[in-house]
Structures are given as C-alpha cells and as structure tokens.
C-alpha cells in the first residue's frame, strides 16, 4: 500500500488554508456540492500511482443525485476539496500514535501537488454543464480548520 484516501461527499466544505495573524485575517478555500478527498502518501509511493488514484477517485459512483441514484463527482457534476491528511498514516503504539510509514515531507509535497494538478486537469476537461465545478485544496504540512456540511454519513476509505 502506497497511499490511503478517505472520501466524503459534501454539500458544502470550507477549509482554512492560512490562520489569522496580527496583520491579516484567515484565508479559506471552499467548494459546494461534490466531494472532500483526504489523502496520505506512504513510503515508497511514486508519481506512477497518481493517475490510477485520480481516475478511481473521480469516477467512482459515490455521489447521490437528486433522484437518489449514485454517480461520480465528474458526472454529478461536482467540485472537489483535497485535504492533505498525514494522520491517515498513523498506527497506535501504546497510548500514542506513530507515523513512521508516512512518506517524507518533501516527497509527499511533490506527490500532493501532482495529485492536485491532475485532479484539476481531469475536472476541467469534463465540464458537461453550466454548473461551476472546481478543485480546491489545502496546504500540505500545515494544520487546517475544516467546516463540512454533508448529506449523510457517507465516508469511504480507499487504499492504493
């Protein structure tokens, strides 16, 4: 296994990508209907894995339509919020958690940027309506605040 992903369908999601400081307010990115993708890469992951991940995640039928049928985020059409989530790689040890299996920060950042870029490319090439669809993403390596409105506890774990 080289990557772990959690998918959560959403009605609206808002992610703080820069905390407030003395000189500026917090910065946020947000999406409307679509999917939140939490992603963690493990040691040994390479860029070769990214196309398969993006194809699977954007085409899997996990989004519920108005009629109650399930479709992909591409066919919905919906937006995607990508959240780097290194804690998905944690393993319990005693009363704490260890993250020794996670990829190094520099390598992880490169894979994350490639993943985001390919998601953006796939979503933009699949515009099939006038509905605004977009890919937004969090900041790799930083703590972030997430606000999420979901249409049911509909969360899936996928490993690649």
Swiss-Prot record:
SUPFAM superfamilies: DTD-like. It is found in: Cytoplasm. Keywords: Cytoplasm, Hydrolase, RNA-binding, tRNA-binding. Its EC number is 3.1.1.96. It comes from the Eukaryota. One of its GO terms (molecular function) is Ala-tRNA(Thr) deacylase activity. It is an enzyme of class 3 (hydrolase). A motif (Gly-transPro motif, allows the protein to recognize chirality of D-amino acids) lies at residues 152-153. It holds the Pfam family Tyr_Deacylase. GO terms for biological process: aminoacyl-tRNA metabolism involved in translational fidelity; tRNA metabolic process. The keyword Nucleotide-binding does not apply. It catalyses: a D-aminoacyl-tRNA + H2O = a tRNA + a D-alpha-amino acid + H(+); glycyl-tRNA(Ala) + H2O = tRNA(Ala) + glycine + H(+); D-tyrosyl-tRNA(Tyr) + H2O = D-tyrosine + tRNA(Tyr); L-alanyl-tRNA(Thr) + H2O = tRNA(Thr) + L-alanine + H(+). Its main location: cytoplasm. One of its GO terms (cellular component) is cytoplasm. Deacylates mischarged D-aminoacyl-tRNAs. Also deacylates mischarged glycyl-tRNA(Ala), protecting cells against glycine mischarging by AlaRS. Probably acts by rejecting L-amino acids from its binding site rather than specific recognition of D-amino acids. Catalyzes the hydrolysis of D-tyrosyl-tRNA(Tyr), has no activity on correctly charged L-tyrosyl-tRNA(Tyr). By recycling D-aminoacyl-tRNA to D-amino acids and free tRNA molecules, this enzyme counteracts the toxicity associated with the formation of D-aminoacyl-tRNA entities in vivo and helps enforce protein L-homochirality. Homodimer. Belongs to the DTD family. A Gly-transPro motif from one monomer fits into the active site of the other monomer to allow specific chiral rejection of most L-amino acids except L-Ala. The trans conformation of the motif is maintained by Arg-143. This is D-aminoacyl-tRNA deacylase 2.
């Amino acid at each position: 296994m080289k990557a772990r992903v959690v998918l959560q369908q959403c009605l609206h999601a808002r992610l703080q990508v820069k905390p407030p400081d003395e000189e500026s307010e917090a910065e946020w990115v947000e999406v409307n209907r679509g999917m939140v993708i939490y992603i963690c890469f493990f040691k040994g992951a390479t860029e070769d894995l990214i196309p398969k991940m993006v194809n699977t995640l954007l085409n899997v039928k996990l989004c519920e339509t108005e009629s109650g049928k399930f479709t992909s985020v591409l066919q919905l059409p919906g937006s995607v919020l990508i959240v780097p989530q290194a804690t998905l790689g944690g393993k319990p040890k005693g009363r704490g958690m260890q993250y020794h299996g996670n990829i190094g920060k520099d390598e992880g950042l490169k894979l994350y940027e490639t993943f985001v870029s390919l998601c953006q490319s796939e979503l933009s090439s699949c515009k099939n309506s006038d509905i605004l669809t977009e890919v937004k993403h969090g900041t790799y390596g930083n703590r972030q605040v997430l606000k999420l409105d979901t249409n049911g506890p509909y969360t899936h774990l996928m490993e690649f």
